[in-house]
């Protein structure tokens, strides 16, 4: 599974951009294209959608945005164009609407019917409630870690031992929970948790864990 492309944005239009990588150009449709700049070197998370007639690559600014896109298109009647339209309203805004069971506001998004909005909330409300809770916990832990590092730098407190094991345990628990929500099996998750290196950026931690699972021979079909 290819997770992202890294390259230079050589052109952008209203709905898509062209990313150059090792002499090849990739046409990628993205939501909220204003976030991407021409001549910028950028990592873009990708999803390749293929049917009997076409193969289109969609790109995202973050891995979490890619996950949300996949969830949206898993709903019958919601295609990639509708999912991109929904993401144009903002990823976090969309997550908050789903988590809050606000299908009425969701249904106001262009191309998204009331029926589909209700189904999205029905399928994913609990998941995105947990996503928000995990994000909140991770932010609090990151702030706590920063404060602890400041104490280590600025204060001569040799007699104080700052406990980091709880932070590590919570991060591992959040990672495990996220991988479960993404559909990975317990054996795959356990393997990733034993191999992944610590990373202060939780999204990078998820990405690295998925790479480990994808590259493991025992989990290949």
Swiss-Prot record:
Annotated region described as Flexible linker, given as residue ranges: 140-166
Keywords on this record?
Answer: Cytoplasm, DNA damage, DNA recombination, DNA repair, DNA-binding
Map out region (Domain II) in residue numbers: 62-139
Known Pfam families for this protein? Answer: HHH_5, RuvA_C, RuvA_N
Where is this protein localized, as stated in its record? Answer: Cytoplasm
Query: Per its database record, what is this protein's job?
Result: The RuvA-RuvB-RuvC complex processes Holliday junction (HJ) DNA during genetic recombination and DNA repair, while the RuvA-RuvB complex plays an important role in the rescue of blocked DNA replication forks via replication fork reversal (RFR). RuvA specifically binds to HJ cruciform DNA, conferring on it an open structure. The RuvB hexamer acts as an ATP-dependent pump, pulling dsDNA into and through the RuvAB complex. HJ branch migration allows RuvC to scan DNA until it finds its consensus sequence, where it cleaves and resolves the cruciform DNA.
Record note on domains: Has three domains with a flexible linker between the domains II and III and assumes an 'L' shape. Domain III is highly mobile and contacts RuvB.
This protein's name:
Holliday junction branch migration complex subunit RuvA
**What is the organism of origin for this protein?**
Mesomycoplasma hyopneumoniae (strain 7448)
């Amino acid at each position: 599974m290819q997770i992202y492309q890294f390259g230079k944005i050589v052109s952008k239009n209203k709905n898509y951009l062209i990313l150059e990588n090792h002499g090849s150009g990739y046409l990628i449709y993205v939501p909220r294209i204003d976030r991407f700049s021409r001549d910028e070197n950028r990592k873009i998370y990708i999803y390749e959608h293929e049917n009997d007639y076409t193969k289109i690559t969609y790109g995202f600014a973050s891995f979490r945005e890619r996950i949300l896109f996949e969830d949206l298109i898993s709903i019958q009647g919601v295609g990639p164009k509708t999912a991109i339209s929904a993401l144009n309203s903002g990823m976090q805004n969309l997550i908050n609407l789903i988590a809050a069971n606000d299908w009425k506001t969701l249904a106001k998004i262009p191309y998204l019917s009331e029926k589909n909005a209700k189904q999205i909330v029905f399928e994913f409300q609990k998941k995105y409630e947990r996503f928000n809770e995990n994000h909140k916990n991770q932010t609090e832990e990151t702030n706590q870690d920063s404060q602890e590092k400041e104490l280590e730098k600025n204060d001569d407190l040799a007699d104080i031992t700052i406990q980091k094991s709880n932070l590590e345990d919570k991060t591992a628990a959040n990672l495990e929970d996220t991988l479960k929500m993404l559909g990975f099996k317990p054996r795959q998750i356990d393997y990733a948790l034993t191999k992944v290196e610590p990373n202060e950026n939780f999204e990078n931690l998820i990405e690295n864990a998925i790479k480990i699972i994808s590259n493991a021979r025992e989990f290949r079909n």
